[in-house]
Regions:
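A structured beta-alpha segment of the ubiquitous adenosine-cofactor-binding alpha/beta core
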Residues: 61-80
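Oxidoreductase and adenylate-handling cofactor-binding alpha/beta cores
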Residues: 141-164
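Conserved acidic residues
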Residues: 35, 58, 81
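Beta-strand-loop-alpha-helix segment that lines the small-molecule cofactor/substrate pocket
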Residues: 82, 88-140, 155
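Conserved small/polar residues in nucleotide/adenosyl-binding loops
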Residues: 167-172
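Hydrophobic alpha-helical segments, chiefly the membrane-spanning helices
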Residues: 179-185
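N-terminal Rossmann-like dinucleotide-binding module
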Residues: 1-55
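Nucleotide donor/acceptor-binding cores
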Residues: 3-5, 131, 161
Length: 185
């Protein structure tokens, strides 16, 4: 197997569902190694969470700027290569932009940004810097979805004529507001 991609995470600490999903998904195929990140706006909480994950405390940062500054001082073979952005929606753009401008590949939770113009700007930076920028669609990583995909590909369930999907959530009506996001902010 080739060397694992060194991963950092912004947000997604504690009992954050999206944080759990990203950590599990990144470990499913043994392609990523979580190196560090910023898991909570309160550094002490972030440090404690990093300790629970078995991370070196020197790689659990107080904020994005300190992470970028510290990681960029490291030898290229040791620094974080890609960062998952799991923060409240309104922070996706400024954080992803800063990461791209500092030569980190980005894996961003939905929504990519809160405006079309921001999305175009990120796309242009990504192209100029020749970096990878991915927006997650986490259902593709679920074991049941993978099994269903294999069953369809192998003809186990016959020809598919129609697919109906239902996504249930206990999220409040205001959970889709772009100025919110993150249930503890």
């Amino acid at each position: 197997m080739s060397e694992k991609i060194r991963l950092g995470i912004l947000g997604g600490g504690g009992d954050s569902l999206i944080g759990v999903l990203h950590r599990v998904a990144s470990s499913m195929h043994d392609k990523y190694k979580l190196i560090g990140g910023v898991f909570n706006p309160e550094h002490a909480i972030s440090l404690d969470f990093g300790k629970q994950l078995g991370l070196d405390s020197s790689r659990v940062y107080k904020d994005l700027d300190s992470m970028i500054e510290s990681e960029n001082k490291l030898d290229k073979k040791d620094r974080i290569q890609a960062v998952s952005v799991l923060t409240p929606n309104f922070l996706h753009f400024p954080m992803a932009k800063s990461l791209l401008e500092n030569d980190f590949h980005v894996i961003c939770e939905k929504p990519l940004t809160t405006t079309y113009d921001e999305a175009i700007e990120l796309s242009q930076i990504k192209k100029t810097k020749k970096l990878v920028f991915a927006v997650t669609y986490t259902y593709t990583g679920y074991p049941m979805v993978r099994q269903m995909t294999d069953m369809v590909k192998n003809g186990v369930i016959g020809k598919i004529h129609k697919v109906c999907l239902l996504y249930t959530s206990d999220a409040a009506d205001d959970s889709l507001r772009v100025d919110l996001g993150g249930r503890r902010i």
